[in-house]
Protein backbone atom coordinates (compact mmCIF):
# COMPACT_ATOMS: atom_id res chain seq x y z
CA UNK A 1 0.00 0.00 0.00
CA UNK A 2 2.71 2.48 1.00
CA UNK A 3 4.74 1.70 -2.13
CA UNK A 4 1.72 2.24 -4.38
CA UNK A 5 0.91 5.52 -2.64
CA UNK A 6 4.36 6.85 -3.53
CA UNK A 7 3.48 6.69 -7.24
CA UNK A 8 -0.20 7.69 -7.22
CA UNK A 9 -2.19 10.66 -5.93
CA UNK A 10 -5.08 8.56 -4.66
CA UNK A 11 -5.69 4.93 -3.68
CA UNK A 12 -8.84 2.92 -4.31
CA UNK A 13 -10.48 -0.25 -3.03
CA UNK A 14 -12.78 -2.96 -4.40
CA UNK A 15 -14.42 -4.14 -1.16
CA UNK A 16 -16.43 -7.20 -2.18
CA UNK A 17 -17.09 -9.33 0.93
CA UNK A 18 -17.23 -12.57 -1.07
CA UNK A 19 -13.63 -12.20 -2.25
CA UNK A 20 -12.10 -10.63 0.87
CA UNK A 21 -10.69 -12.65 3.79
CA UNK A 22 -12.55 -12.21 7.11
CA UNK A 23 -15.61 -10.76 5.35
CA UNK A 24 -17.26 -13.70 3.60
CA UNK A 25 -18.55 -15.36 6.77
CA UNK A 26 -21.62 -13.22 7.57
CA UNK A 27 -24.72 -12.20 5.60
CA UNK A 28 -24.25 -9.24 3.27
CA UNK A 29 -26.06 -6.55 5.26
CA UNK A 30 -24.62 -7.16 8.74
CA UNK A 31 -22.11 -5.20 10.81
CA UNK A 32 -18.97 -6.89 9.54
CA UNK A 33 -19.77 -6.21 5.89
CA UNK A 34 -21.45 -2.84 6.47
CA UNK A 35 -18.08 -1.52 7.71
CA UNK A 36 -15.89 -3.46 5.26
CA UNK A 37 -15.63 -0.72 2.63
CA UNK A 38 -14.90 2.01 5.17
CA UNK A 39 -12.32 -0.07 7.07
CA UNK A 40 -10.40 -1.17 3.98
CA UNK A 41 -10.44 2.28 2.42
CA UNK A 42 -9.26 3.93 5.64
CA UNK A 43 -6.46 1.36 5.89
CA UNK A 44 -5.29 2.28 2.38
CA UNK A 45 -5.57 6.01 2.98
CA UNK A 46 -3.92 5.96 6.40
CA UNK A 47 -1.00 3.71 5.48
CA UNK A 48 -0.51 5.44 2.13
CA UNK A 49 -1.05 8.92 3.58
CA UNK A 50 -3.09 9.88 0.52
CA UNK A 51 -6.84 10.24 -0.12
CA UNK A 52 -8.66 6.96 -0.79
CA UNK A 53 -12.08 6.04 -2.13
CA UNK A 54 -14.27 3.03 -2.88
CA UNK A 55 -13.61 2.69 -6.59
CA UNK A 56 -15.86 -0.35 -7.10
CA UNK A 57 -18.48 -1.97 -4.88
CA UNK A 58 -21.58 -4.05 -5.42
CA UNK A 59 -23.78 -6.81 -4.08
CA UNK A 60 -22.79 -9.44 -6.72
CA UNK A 61 -26.42 -9.84 -7.66
CA UNK A 62 -29.27 -12.13 -6.58
CA UNK A 63 -26.94 -15.05 -5.89
CA UNK A 64 -25.98 -13.23 -2.67
CA UNK A 65 -28.87 -10.92 -1.81
CA UNK A 66 -32.28 -9.70 -2.84
CA UNK A 67 -32.67 -6.27 -4.41
CA UNK A 68 -33.97 -4.84 -1.13
CA UNK A 69 -31.12 -6.28 0.93
CA UNK A 70 -28.63 -4.95 -1.65
CA UNK A 71 -30.14 -1.47 -1.26
CA UNK A 72 -29.89 -1.66 2.53
CA UNK A 73 -26.27 -2.82 2.20
CA UNK A 74 -25.46 0.10 -0.11
CA UNK A 75 -27.10 2.61 2.23
CA UNK A 76 -24.98 1.39 5.16
CA UNK A 77 -21.84 1.37 3.00
CA UNK A 78 -22.51 4.93 1.79
CA UNK A 79 -23.09 6.35 5.26
CA UNK A 80 -20.09 4.58 6.77
CA UNK A 81 -17.79 5.58 3.92
CA UNK A 82 -18.96 9.19 4.11
CA UNK A 83 -18.52 9.34 7.88
CA UNK A 84 -14.98 7.92 7.63
CA UNK A 85 -13.73 10.41 5.03
CA UNK A 86 -13.66 7.97 2.13
CA UNK A 87 -13.76 10.37 -0.81
CA UNK A 88 -16.28 8.63 -3.04
CA UNK A 89 -18.04 5.39 -3.98
CA UNK A 90 -18.79 3.85 -7.39
CA UNK A 91 -21.31 1.02 -7.79
CA UNK A 92 -20.64 -1.78 -10.26
CA UNK A 93 -22.33 -1.42 -12.59
CA UNK A 94 -24.82 0.70 -14.54
CA UNK A 95 -26.96 -1.96 -16.26
CA UNK A 96 -27.83 -5.62 -15.91
CA UNK A 97 -26.29 -7.66 -18.73
CA UNK A 98 -28.74 -10.54 -19.08
CA UNK A 99 -28.82 -10.51 -22.89
CA UNK A 100 -25.10 -10.50 -23.73
CA UNK A 101 -23.85 -13.84 -25.15
CA UNK A 102 -20.10 -13.27 -24.72
CA UNK A 103 -17.74 -13.60 -21.78
CA UNK A 104 -17.81 -13.08 -18.85
CA UNK A 105 -21.61 -13.09 -19.00
CA UNK A 106 -21.73 -16.46 -20.76
CA UNK A 107 -19.37 -18.00 -18.23
CA UNK A 108 -20.43 -16.58 -14.86
CA UNK A 109 -24.05 -16.11 -13.84
CA UNK A 110 -23.03 -13.74 -11.06
CA UNK A 111 -21.88 -11.17 -13.65
CA UNK A 112 -25.28 -10.71 -15.29
CA UNK A 113 -27.39 -8.86 -12.70
CA UNK A 114 -25.09 -6.30 -11.07
CA UNK A 115 -26.64 -3.13 -12.46
CA UNK A 116 -28.37 -0.12 -11.00
CA UNK A 117 -30.88 -0.62 -13.82
CA UNK A 118 -32.59 -3.85 -14.85
CA UNK A 119 -32.42 -5.05 -18.46
CA UNK A 120 -35.70 -3.22 -19.18
CA UNK A 121 -34.03 -0.03 -17.81
CA UNK A 122 -36.25 0.17 -14.74
CA UNK A 123 -34.34 1.35 -11.64
CA UNK A 124 -33.52 -1.03 -8.82
CA UNK A 125 -33.73 0.02 -5.15
CA UNK A 126 -29.93 0.49 -5.12
CA UNK A 127 -30.25 3.29 -7.67
CA UNK A 128 -32.88 5.02 -5.57
CA UNK A 129 -30.65 4.78 -2.47
CA UNK A 130 -27.68 6.16 -4.40
CA UNK A 131 -29.73 9.12 -5.60
CA UNK A 132 -31.16 9.88 -2.16
CA UNK A 133 -27.73 9.75 -0.58
CA UNK A 134 -26.17 11.99 -3.21
CA UNK A 135 -28.84 14.64 -2.69
CA UNK A 136 -28.36 14.46 1.09
CA UNK A 137 -24.55 14.64 0.96
CA UNK A 138 -24.68 17.75 -1.22
CA UNK A 139 -26.57 19.55 1.58
CA UNK A 140 -24.84 18.05 4.63
CA UNK A 141 -21.06 18.46 4.65
CA UNK A 142 -19.35 16.79 7.60
CA UNK A 143 -16.62 18.16 9.88
CA UNK A 144 -13.15 16.64 9.79
CA UNK A 145 -13.13 12.97 10.76
CA UNK A 146 -11.82 12.54 14.31
CA UNK A 147 -9.68 9.54 15.26
CA UNK A 148 -9.10 8.62 18.90
CA UNK A 149 -6.27 6.08 18.60
CA UNK A 150 -3.49 4.86 16.32
CA UNK A 151 -3.52 1.15 15.46
CA UNK A 152 0.02 -0.03 14.73
CA UNK A 153 0.07 -3.06 12.44
CA UNK A 154 3.20 -5.06 13.18
CA UNK A 155 5.36 -7.20 10.94
CA UNK A 156 4.71 -10.88 10.18
CA UNK A 157 1.01 -10.72 11.01
CA UNK A 158 -2.16 -10.79 8.92
CA UNK A 159 -2.25 -7.01 8.74
CA UNK A 160 -5.61 -6.79 6.96
CA UNK A 161 -7.30 -9.24 9.33
CA UNK A 162 -5.85 -7.64 12.45
CA UNK A 163 -6.59 -4.13 11.22
CA UNK A 164 -10.14 -4.94 10.14
CA UNK A 165 -11.12 -6.65 13.37
CA UNK A 166 -9.42 -3.94 15.44
CA UNK A 167 -11.53 -1.41 13.52
CA UNK A 168 -14.72 -3.32 14.32
CA UNK A 169 -13.87 -3.87 17.99
CA UNK A 170 -12.98 -0.19 18.37
CA UNK A 171 -16.34 0.72 16.85
CA UNK A 172 -18.13 -1.50 19.34
CA UNK A 173 -16.12 0.09 22.17
CA UNK A 174 -17.07 3.59 21.01
CA UNK A 175 -13.90 5.00 19.47
CA UNK A 176 -12.25 5.32 16.04
CA UNK A 177 -8.75 4.32 14.97
CA UNK A 178 -6.13 5.46 12.49
CA UNK A 179 -3.81 2.88 10.90
CA UNK A 180 -0.07 2.79 10.41
CA UNK A 181 2.55 0.12 9.81
CA UNK A 182 5.16 -0.53 12.49
CA UNK A 183 7.96 0.51 10.13
CA UNK A 184 6.42 3.94 9.48
CA UNK A 185 7.12 7.06 11.57
CA UNK A 186 5.01 7.03 14.72
CA UNK A 187 1.88 9.13 14.34
CA UNK A 188 1.18 11.48 17.27
CA UNK A 189 -1.59 10.23 19.56
CA UNK A 190 -2.60 9.84 23.18
CA UNK A 191 -3.77 6.27 22.60
CA UNK A 192 -1.95 3.46 20.74
CA UNK A 193 -2.96 -0.10 19.91
CA UNK A 194 -0.42 -2.79 19.02
CA UNK A 195 -2.82 -5.70 18.51
CA UNK A 196 -2.29 -9.42 17.89
CA UNK A 197 1.51 -9.44 17.79
CA UNK A 198 2.90 -12.73 16.53
CA UNK A 199 6.29 -14.29 15.89
CA UNK A 200 9.69 -12.81 16.64
CA UNK A 201 9.75 -9.98 14.09
CA UNK A 202 7.21 -7.48 15.40
CA UNK A 203 8.61 -3.94 15.53
CA UNK A 204 12.06 -2.39 15.26
CA UNK A 205 13.85 -1.44 18.45
CA UNK A 206 14.01 2.27 17.59
CA UNK A 207 10.27 2.39 16.84
CA UNK A 208 9.53 0.49 20.07
CA UNK A 209 11.63 2.95 22.07
CA UNK A 210 9.79 5.80 20.37
CA UNK A 211 6.50 4.23 21.41
CA UNK A 212 7.67 3.77 25.01
CA UNK A 213 8.74 7.41 25.09
CA UNK A 214 5.22 8.42 24.04
CA UNK A 215 3.87 6.36 26.94
CA UNK A 216 6.28 8.07 29.33
CA UNK A 217 4.92 11.38 28.06
CA UNK A 218 1.36 10.34 28.95
CA UNK A 219 0.07 8.25 26.05
CA UNK A 220 -1.73 4.95 26.63
CA UNK A 221 -0.54 1.75 24.94
Model-found features: residue ranges?
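Carbohydrate-binding surfaces of carbohydrate-active enzymes
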Residues: 38-39, 43-221
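Aromatic- and acid-rich polysaccharide-binding/catalytic face
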Residues: 1-34, 87, 191-196
Amino acid sequence: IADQAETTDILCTHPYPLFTPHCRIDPVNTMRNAFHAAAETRLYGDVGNVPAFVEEAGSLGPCLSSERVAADYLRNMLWNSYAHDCRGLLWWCGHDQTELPHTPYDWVGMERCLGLLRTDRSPKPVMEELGKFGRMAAKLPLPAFRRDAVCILSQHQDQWGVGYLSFLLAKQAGFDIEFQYADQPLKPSKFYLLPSVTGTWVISRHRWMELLHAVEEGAVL
